[in-house]
Amino acid sequence: MGELQDWSVTTCLLLLLFQASQIHCTSQTHVLNRLLYRSKRGFGSSVDTNHLNAIRHLSVSSPQNTSGVNQQEQKERDLIENLPGQPSVSFRQYGGYVTVNESAGRSLYYYFVEATKTKKSLPLVLWLNGGPGCSSLYGAFQELGPFRIYGDGKTLYTNPYSWNNVANILFLESPVGTGFSYTNTESDLENPGDMKAAADKYIFLVKWLERFPEYKGREFYIAGESYAGHYVPQLAQTILVHNKNQNFINLRGILIGNPTLNDIVETTGSFDYLVSHALLSQDSLLSYKENCATDTPKMEVDCIALSMKIDDDIKKMNLYNILTPTCINATLTPLTNQSKECTTVLQYEPCGMQYIAAYLNREDVQRSMHVTKLPHTWMLCNEATGFNWNQTDYSASMLPILKELMKHDQLRVWVYTGDTDTVIPLTVTMHALKMMNLTAVTDWLPWFSEGQVGGFTEEYKGNFRYATVIGAGHEVPLYKPKAALTLFKHFIRNSPLPLTP
């Protein structure tokens, strides 16, 4: 396959994916750079194990506390008495910083919510959003956390399908430069990448467990979505490598949704999804094949023009969930009794991202969450982080790491996909899983949530399960909170998804 042809493919995907920047905030130039890098190495490249080997030999500096901070006292200072505008709750919540490199002044922000009941025995779960450079507070306040934000941008309401009904949930803003996380050393922000992020997350976790020692030895899980398809397995492998020292972490499994797993299959999988859902016409696909997908492609301009047409056809929809509307008017509105009655977790709010930004940039909110006064506003995603991310890391396959994790009998690996996402659609994930040569131990069957089909699932040897969620987009807990909680509950309990209503 020639470079000109590859370039046209990446141009097309660039235009398709740029519309998705409304959530991930990745700039057009950044996406182009990433995809151009992929085209240069070729789409037919075999799955390599470079990243697995890098994780195996990842050097993590000593996470020992050298600042003289009393961790118990710091934990007490991290306690959040109440978030502004929150309803009353029965669980404790904490927010604060853990320094992962004292000489550089590099600190990561966390928000932690205890389980609603039996918190002393339930496991600890670390949640990571993707990007790279997107805040996990989005997951906390828009997806699986205990609160959602009303349209006034200052009042919270309860999420009855919060994952802290099942476990203690720790949200981490990483890598440095994401959300409220910061560094005093400018060079920390210049060359971000997977290895640095994995090392910082591991150091954070070890030091956080010193602050919250009651969770040492507790069952521990890592979950996340999107580019956390890199973060989660890399951190899991890092933990296993370093568990031989005194900082043992009782890792029992990983859960990743709509994940970036293998760069090679993203092109074919994306086209497959768009055509199968009538979002890309057969004529456009045929024209693409005739103009661009040949050994002697036509003039470059033909491919660019076709890419522009495809982009124009789909750019007005929500590419993160093709069944939901886009945000048209993001103006904050006063809260009334009527608006309270009309707002529920089960009703998708297309402008929810704007409500989060308004809430987290309030001075009283940041004060209650123990946020250091930063010279910039909180943003859902840091464009510079995504733009500067190591291109080799972007293109690395996570499949070898997943297969390595499957060798550990005590670990379970679950992957799930919302089936109305076009950014990382189920066809991309299914192509990637096919490359793993998994051995199925069950049929492809429907699973149920509260009497209705929640999606389809299949289990494989090696404690590996794949599940789809019907009607859910890129952020499954946002669009289908009931089904997401059912899936999470069975993952934590290590039980099969319900196969009967």
Curated annotation (Swiss-Prot):
Its EC number is 3.4.16.-. Glycans are attached at N65, N101, N329, N337, N390, N437. Coiled coil: none annotated. It is found in: Secreted. Expressed in seedlings, roots, leaves, flowers and siliques. Belongs to the peptidase S10 family. Probable carboxypeptidase. This is Serine carboxypeptidase-like 39. It comes from Arabidopsis thaliana.
